[in-house]
Amino acid sequence: MNYATVNDLCARYTRTRLDILTRPKTADGQPDDAVAEQALADASAFIDGYLAARFVLPLTVVPSLLKRQCCVVAWFYLNESQPTEQITATYRDTVRWLEQVRDGKTDPGVESRTAASPEGEDLVQVQSDPPVFSRKQKGFI
């Protein structure tokens, strides 16, 4: 699941700039939204790597802040051959923010869901006898 769409990228960076970036990456030299969609998919997977530490994925609702961060990462990926200092700095800020989300220092606005714990009284329990050999046994051999 992508956290942003091509329309989100266009709204943030303009359609003209997006077309200029996607044109050289196609065989016929025409702008192609598939290139932008691939960058958004890669950015979403990158973000999932950080979110998976605290949240159950996929998210049911994507907050606007996460949508923005996805656009920033995708824009960096689209500019991979010649990123400007501003694009690189914004990308690094996004990575720092994702690290803070992963570590629990920042709230991304996502509903905190944990994995469902099993419910019921007939749960499996495993018991075993104490170990036969241990380091405390001396003079055995």
UniProtKB/Swiss-Prot annotation:
Stimuli inducing this protein: Expressed in the late phase of the viral replicative cycle. Expression of late genes is activated by the viral late transcription activator C.
Leader peptide range in chain numbering: none
GO annotations of cellular component type: host cell cytoplasm
Subcellular location per the Swiss-Prot or TrEMBL entry: Host cytoplasm
Observed effect of gene inactivation: Accumulation of unattached tails and full heads.
Alphabetized Pfam families for the sequence: Phage_Mu_Gp36
Cited InterPro entries: Phage_Mu_GpJ
Coiled coil regions, renumbered to chain: none
Region annotated Disordered, chain positions: 102-141
Keywords, ordered alphabetically: Host cytoplasm, Late protein
UniProt-recorded name of the protein: Gene product J
